[in-house]
């Protein structure tokens, strides 16, 4: 009669089974990771290099420059530089981004690719929070200069889009409104300072408009007066009243309209 296994031995066997399964899973994960790293390295090699193949480079051609020295002619193959398009390697688990809105991991998204903003496509709010605005609006509404947009680090990211008003015009530059607001606060310091600057500019703009308006009114009045004076000077005809006796043979008539007096004598 065989002795029954002790409970302690059975527990050790179960632990060995669980441990072996965990080890096998870890080995499999390491193997998959090694394969992915190998694929990433291979993707960085656009052309395979064959073993045992050697190339013999011909001596460069020498050209007399006529100035007392010789120059070497570059080969056409050396002058032509091909643009090698390299496919990005696979995204590893450690390369995942964490969404600022929902906290979930994601590989890439519209906002992360174009504006370096870690927000997944599911959480993107194109109408409000992640709205895009034009460069003109960014300069007028948030009082940013070209240097604030293009020179100040980090340079604001943008996308190009066809102008909806006229396709023949240049492409529009669209910026992320949240990043524009952040840059505006960096420039002006606070929202209150920005609003004060807006009020000052508005007052100056209104003063300039009023000044231009007053100048136009003044010119218009001058033009009207000049035209009336010319009309009166060229088209007025005297309408004299009754004749008045002044002395002996002298008489006069007075214009009813302008008061001009005409003196004359009668023989």
UniProtKB/Swiss-Prot annotation:
Pfam families: XPA_C, XPA_N. Keywords: DNA damage, DNA repair, DNA-binding, Metal-binding, Nucleus, Zinc, Zinc-finger. PANTHER family: DNA REPAIR PROTEIN COMPLEMENTING XP-A CELLS. Zn(2+) binds at residues 99, 102, 120, 123. SUPFAM superfamilies: Glucocorticoid receptor-like (DNA-binding domain) (SSF57716), Putative DNA-binding domain (SSF46955). InterPro entries: DNA-bd_dom_put_sf, XPA/RAD14, XPA_C, XPA_CS, XPA_sf, Znf_XPA_CS. The gene is xpa. GO terms for biological process: base-excision repair; nucleotide-excision repair; nucleotide-excision repair involved in interstrand cross-link repair; nucleotide-excision repair, DNA damage recognition; UV-damage excision repair. One of its GO terms (cellular component) is nucleotide-excision repair factor 1 complex. Involved in DNA excision repair. Initiates repair by binding to damaged sites with various affinities, depending on the photoproduct and the transcriptional state of the region. This is DNA repair protein complementing XP-A cells homolog. PROSITE patterns: XPA_1, XPA_2. It comes from Xenopus laevis. A motif (Nuclear localization signal) lies at residues 25-46. It is found in: Nucleus. A zinc finger (unnamed) spans 99-123. GO terms for molecular function: damaged DNA binding; double-stranded DNA binding; zinc ion binding.
